[in-house]
Amino acid sequence: MNLKNPETPDRNLAMELVRVTEAAALASGRWVGRGMKNEGDGAAVDAMRQLINSVTMKGVVVIGEGEKDEAPMLYNGEEVGTGFGPEVDIAVDPVDGTTLMAEGRPNAISILAAAERGTMYDPSSVFYMKKIAVGPEAAGKIDIEAPVAHNINAVAKSKGINPSDVTVVVLDRPRHIELIADIRRAGAKVRLISDGDVAGAVAAAQDSNSVDIMMGTGGTPEGIITACAMKCMGGEIQGILAPMNDFERQKAHDAGLVLDQVLHTNDLVSSDNCYFVATGVTNGDMLRGVSYRANGATTRSLVMRAKSGTIRHIESVHQLSKLQEYSVVDYTTAT
């Protein structure tokens, strides 16, 4: 390889990456509704780690399962892939919505995002971010520092609807009580979700969904993954880091981060050559979940590439005998 001109991600990478999220969804799918989120998440991590190392790339996990001493696999800074091919930053969430998965509730998904090496934002252990995300019609029209009503009116105008027809998806958390009140005072509707704000943001950017905006404070890693999706869909995300304690504030200071800076889509992912891949674990607004039958299973995935603007919906039929290769989980029974 010419180190001065390393390979850049190409269209083939997207189809390799979807195999990774399919494996994670299949591994965690057997744990849906069983009330065991750690076991289900662990199965997804195992499967994702196994499959991601078969992908032709020189990947580095930028957004993973935690620091090296906290996560045995898919930790921040871990090198993944075959060691050949394009050099990429990787962001993973083997199960976005572990509680949703454990309780058998909608919108649990397995996610992987990728971009050219060195182009993903590193939040330096600041785990939360105030966020707003919208679809293509309202991109460039929102301002995270403006009042809630301003953004609702801007989205309504850009979509040609009344503010009363705008639906805002918000994580159901005590910290959002005032935000929810502001949304309703502006005349808009609120859709509360218990987990999974990546799925909420993607739903807001899809024409076929009845969600128009995602607002609120959620995970910074999810914000970066969402930025990859917005790049692919033509939407927009804005964020402001929201450290929860002095330790996070110090980590941000040590890393040279500006806490009151508005982070735009391009700040979170600076490359236009990026990918977003997701496979449904449970049925949801964005994707249907894994469905099992006697001799195998079916998965539904969303595969997007920003450079080409291509969005693919993929339904895959998997043979039961092959599923056993993905994880230690027994796919024949829910043990």
Swiss-Prot record:
Cofactor: Mn(2+); Mg(2+)
Induction: The FBPase protein levels during growth on glucose, gluconate, ribose, pyruvate, lacatate, or citrate do not vary much (inferior or equal to two-fold) with respect to the carbon source.
Phenotype upon loss of function: Strains lacking this gene are unable to grow on the carbon sources acetate, citrate, glutamate, and lactate and display no detectable fructose-1,6-bisphosphatase activity.
Binding positions for Mn(2+) 1 per the UniProt entry: D41, E65
Pfam families: FBPase_glpX
Protein name: Fructose-1,6-bisphosphatase class 2
UniProt-listed InterPro entries: FBPase_class-2/SBPase (IPR004464)
Major enzyme class: hydrolase
Self-association state and partner proteins as the record states: Homotetramer.
Pathway(s) it belongs to: Carbohydrate biosynthesis; gluconeogenesis
Source species of the chain: Corynebacterium glutamicum (strain ATCC 13032 / DSM 20300 / JCM 1318 / BCRC 11384 / CCUG 27702 / LMG 3730 / NBRC 12168 / NCIMB 10025 / NRRL B-2784 / 534)
Keyword rRNA-binding assigned: no
Annotated Mn(2+) 2 binding sites: D93, D96, E222
Gene Ontology CC, one term: cytosol
Amino-acid positions noted as binding substrate in the UniProt annotation, renumbered to this chain: D96, G97, T98, Y128, R173, P174, R175, D195, G196, D197, G219
Gene Ontology biological-process entries: fructose 1,6-bisphosphate metabolic process; gluconeogenesis; glycerol metabolic process
Family of this protein: Belongs to the FBPase class 2 family.
Functional summary from the UniProt entry: Catalyzes the hydrolysis of fructose 1,6-bisphosphate to fructose 6-phosphate. Is essential for growth on gluconeogenic carbon sources. Also displays a low activity toward glucose 6-phosphate, and fructose 6-phosphate, glycerol 3-phosphate, ribulose 1,5-bisphosphate and myo-inositol-monophosphate are not significant substrates.
EC number: 3.1.3.11
Main location: cytoplasm
Activity across pH: Optimum pH is 7.7.
